[in-house]
Amino acid sequence: MNGAVIDPLIQEAYGVLETGRSVSYDLATRLATLRGEAVVDLLSLANKVKNRFAAPDGALHSCSILNAKSGACSENCRFCAQSLHNQADVESYSLLDRSKVFEAAGRVYAKGVRHFGIVTSGYGYRTVNKEFQRIIDLITGLREEYPGLKVCASLGVLGSDSAALLADAGIAHYNINLQVSPDRYSDLIADSHSQNDRIETIRLLRKHRIAVCCGAILGVGETMQERIDLIFVLQALDVAVIPLNVLVPVDGTPLEGSLPLAVSDIVKTFALCRLAHPDKVIKFAAGRETVMKDFQGLLMLAGANGFLTGGYLTTRGRDVGDDQAFMEQLKHFSGRS
């Protein structure tokens, strides 16, 4: 009986495990052509890279978010239930008051979650206004109320003054996703603003030494090659956390009839992202329950070392307690159980 043979492409990619340096764009492109059993070997390598460089102590990054301001968004993002341009049935409300935000943070804090994100709908805050100042007060207040809680935010496009205030408030991470490769943003995501607005915000955040959380949405019509393009754009921007969402089609949006991606393509994308970002946090978010279903745990063995827990902006997620138990079981695959 012949012994198992590892594909030469994967053998070449094992250099990441030895050096901690990213695979090249060319090698990532060739790895994307792998099929069948070779994909499992690719996932195995990605998991080893994660364990060695991103989670050597077996630690996983879990975070919870609060939809603190919902709906009535001026932008025309094709996947989003909160856009005024779409016809989705979504609740709209202004910025939540302090008590509701603190209550939400307290619930997940009590269950062991130590990253909590405040998310608002809308284009963003290029200038500082009263609402933005309220958000700053929420961030500082939460940090005082809950010791060790890392408060994050996703507030859209920023200006220099608003970024500076976030830095002064001690924000842990700022999320602003690029979603797809630059040359596909206007036709796949939105044309009411440019992706460059987001890239400029990332540069502002880096200037103010704020760690950036920036990722993608998979399944909006992009190709695998375009996913690789975005993975390397994120590498050039040196973002700290990369959330990968899988499209959950929402009725009343232009993408409501989209077909789900194949699980093999999703896990391959996660693995390639890990090989291009050996030491970063890569977390999976929307779609893990509804699209991945029985295979969601596989993503944590394909290079991911974090996830969003407790629900998303307009859709429900898994219970935080269930996810905490999930994290404990995953430790058995890290060699740190």
From Swiss-Prot:
GO terms (BP aspect): biotin biosynthetic process
Q: Where does [2Fe-2S] cluster bind?
A: 152, 213, 283
Q: What is its EC number?
A: 2.8.1.6
Q: Give the protein's cofactors.
A: [4Fe-4S] cluster; [2Fe-2S] cluster
Sites where the protein binds [4Fe-4S] cluster: 73, 77, 80
Q: Does the keyword Ligase apply?
A: no
Gene Ontology MF: a single term: biotin synthase activity
The protein's annotated catalytic reaction(s) are: (4R,5S)-dethiobiotin + (sulfur carrier)-SH + 2 reduced [2Fe-2S]-[ferredoxin] + 2 S-adenosyl-L-methionine = (sulfur carrier)-H + biotin + 2 5'-deoxyadenosine + 2 L-methionine + 2 oxidized [2Fe-2S]-[ferredoxin]
What pathway is it annotated to?
Cofactor biosynthesis; biotin biosynthesis; biotin from 7,8-diaminononanoate: step 2/2
**Where does the Radical SAM core domain lie?**
55-288
Q: Which CDD domains match?
A: Radical_SAM
Q: Which PROSITE patterns match?
A: RADICAL_SAM
- Per the record, the domain of life is Bacteria
Q: Which SUPFAM superfamilies match?
A: Radical SAM enzymes
Q: Which SMART domains match?
A: BATS, Elp3
Describe cofactor binding as the record notes it.
Binds 1 [4Fe-4S] cluster. The cluster is coordinated with 3 cysteines and an exchangeable S-adenosyl-L-methionine.
Quaternary organization: Homodimer.
What does the UniProt record say this protein does?
Catalyzes the conversion of dethiobiotin (DTB) to biotin by the insertion of a sulfur atom into dethiobiotin via a radical-based mechanism.
The identity of this protein, by name, is Biotin synthase
Gene encoding this chain? bioB
